[in-house]
């Protein structure tokens, strides 16, 4: 057997998480050797691919599941603020990366698109008013508007107004400062920077085994999927950023921190159109309320997307189901992930998450016509012939042990790391990619505890708010926000966005609040 090739850092998976960690470590430790292993033939071809996710820069501006109403009717904004704080960290790092040549083409991955919450019915409009009142006093949400005027609704969202009975109350929380993110293009630029700085990249290679050595390093065996050639690496640190493939690899590694964890795969589907007559009439990411009793992943939204310099509309998500943990995975992924240490967790979720089961069954029974009928709640004039069904990526929801319940399903992103800091991985889904930078800061703090203090001055240069809650520091927020807006070109209209039917565009422009705006 050939001698193991030594590397300081080995990254598994070429998606947004590995790409972000790659760029951060390259900037902090340019002399470290680094190797990337990806099973597919290109970067960001699974969950980070723009067609496999919603592309929302998740900052809780429009996602109503982050702002639940309390029993007394008041609005709990804690989760929304936390998600937004994390997105601000990512936004600041992208700003630094653009300024320093790490990200050479900002418009290829980031476009300004308003983020909008949408409801109908008097009670829901009242909820949206309360949500606005609870959030707008926080600096991170200071530009939010509340709109309940039918005429203003029709002006800003003409496609959604077309064919709608506007005698029924409608309400919007409108934030002009939202973003559409192509995480695939972003990942490729970050990995391109890593490769330029000497990182070895192995595409079309599978990791077949991971085992820890007595000196805490890892022996990682890989195989070329085309030629069958086998290689062995000796890595001081391993990061498993393999999306749905992370859990099986962490199980192979045998770290005790992964014991008890399970995964439940849920597929995504979208209706999409590139019809310019329709894209001109809708220039926002508009999120509604989830169906009663449905899981957070079911929140419906009608989104403007900018992908490869073309404007699209996506509506969904609709759930699909497959036992695969990756879109290009294997049908054995789910059954092979069941182990003695997570069997109770998996069975517990099966017995307690009846709402999810009911939701999935209902989704799987939907016909094409029924999906378009759901779309008509947002765009009443939608025609079946204008829309096509697109199969998106797989998301593996985390199952964690819980006392008295066996296991619970977690909707979010979870970092797992070994106690000795020699290996880490990321599990879960939304807000996921939008929080890649703070998630990787967490990985670095856990796994490089001895070095992290010496990195902090450089990290603070990248992210000026590091260690600070921006909600409590409005002046600092104003400074980093203004700098980011200029550097990231978020003060310019979005690329590939056509003018609306009245010759104006709501995307990527500032506007003066009207009489319809509270």
Swiss-Prot record:
It comes from the Bacteria. Residues 495-518 are annotated as: Disordered. The keyword Transferase does not apply. InterPro entries: FAD/NAD-bd_sf (IPR036188), MQO (IPR006231). Its cofactor is FAD. GO terms for molecular function: 2-hydroxyglutarate dehydrogenase activity; L-malate dehydrogenase (quinone) activity. It catalyses: (S)-malate + a quinone = a quinol + oxaloacetate. Residues 501-518 have a biased composition (Polar residues). Its EC number is 1.1.5.4. Keywords: FAD, Flavoprotein, Oxidoreductase, Tricarboxylic acid cycle. GO terms for biological process: tricarboxylic acid cycle. Pathway: Carbohydrate metabolism; tricarboxylic acid cycle; oxaloacetate from (S)-malate (quinone route): step 1/1. Transmembrane segments: none annotated. The keyword Oxidoreductase applies. Belongs to the MQO family. This is Probable malate:quinone oxidoreductase.
């Amino acid at each position: 057997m050939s001698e193991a090739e030594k590397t300081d850092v080995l990254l598994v998976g070429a998606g947004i998480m590995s790409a972000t960690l790659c760029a951060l470590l390259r900037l902090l430790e340019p002399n470290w050797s680094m190797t990337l292993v990806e099973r597919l033939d290109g970067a960001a071809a699974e969950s980070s691919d723009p067609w496999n996710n919603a592309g929302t820069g998740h900052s809780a501006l429009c996602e109503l599941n982050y702002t639940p109403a309390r029993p007394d009717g008041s609005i709990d904004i804690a989760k929304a603020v936390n998600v937004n704080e994390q997105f601000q960290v990512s936004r600041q790092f992208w700003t630094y990366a653009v300024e320093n040549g790490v990200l050479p083409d900002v418009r290829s991955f980031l476009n300004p698109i308003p983020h909008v919450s949408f409801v109908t019915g008097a009670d829901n409009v009242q909820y949206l008013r309360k949500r606005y009142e609870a959030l707008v006093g926080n600096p991170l949400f200071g530009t939010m508007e509340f709109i309940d005027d039918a005429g203003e609704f029709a002006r800003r969202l003409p496609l959604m107004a077309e064919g709608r009975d506007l005698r029924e109350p409608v309400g919007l929380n409108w934030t002009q400062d939202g973003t559409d993110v192509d995480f695939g293009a972003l990942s490729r630029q970050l990995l391109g920077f890593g490769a330029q700085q000497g990182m070895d990249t192995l595409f079309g290679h599978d990791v077949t085994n991971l085992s820890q050595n007595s000196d805490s390093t890892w022996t990682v065996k890989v195989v070329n999927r085309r030629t069958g050639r086998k290689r062995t690496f000796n890595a001081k640190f391993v990061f498993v950023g393999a999306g749905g493939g992370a859990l099986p690899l962490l199980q192979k590694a045998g770290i005790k921190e992964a014991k008890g964890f399970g995964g439940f795969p849920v597929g995504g589907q979208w209706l999409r159109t590139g019809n310019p007559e329709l894209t001109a009439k809708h220039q926002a990411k508009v999120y509604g309320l989830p169906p009663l009793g449905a899981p957070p992943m079911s929140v419906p939204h009608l989104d403007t997307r900018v992908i490869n310099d073309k404007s699209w509309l996506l509506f969904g998500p609709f759930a699909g189901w497959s036992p695969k943990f990756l879109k290009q995975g294997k049908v054995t992924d789910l059954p092979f992930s069941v182990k003695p240490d997570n069997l109770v967790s998996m069975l517990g979720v099966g017995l307690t998450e009846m709402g999810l089961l009911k939701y999935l069954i209902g989704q799987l029974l939907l016909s094409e016509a029924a999906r378009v009928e759901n779309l008509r709640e947002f765009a009443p004039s939608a025609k079946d012939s204008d829309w096509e069904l697109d199969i998106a990526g797989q998301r593996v929801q985390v199952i964690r042990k819980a006392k008295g319940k066996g296991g619970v399903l977690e909707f979010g992103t979870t970092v797992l790391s070994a106690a000795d800091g020699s290996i880490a991985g990321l599990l879960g889904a939304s807000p996921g990619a939008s929080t890649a930078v703070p998630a990787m800061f967490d990985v670095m703090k856990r796994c490089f505890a001895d070095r992290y203090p010496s990195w902090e001055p450089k990290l603070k240069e990248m992210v000026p708010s590091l260690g600070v809650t921006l909600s409590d520091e409005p002046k600092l927020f104003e400074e980093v926000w203004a700098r980011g807006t200029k550097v990231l070109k978020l003060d310019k209209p979005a690329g590939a966005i056509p003018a609306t039917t009245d010759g104006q565009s709501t995307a990527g422009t500032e506007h003066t609040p009207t009489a319809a705006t509270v």
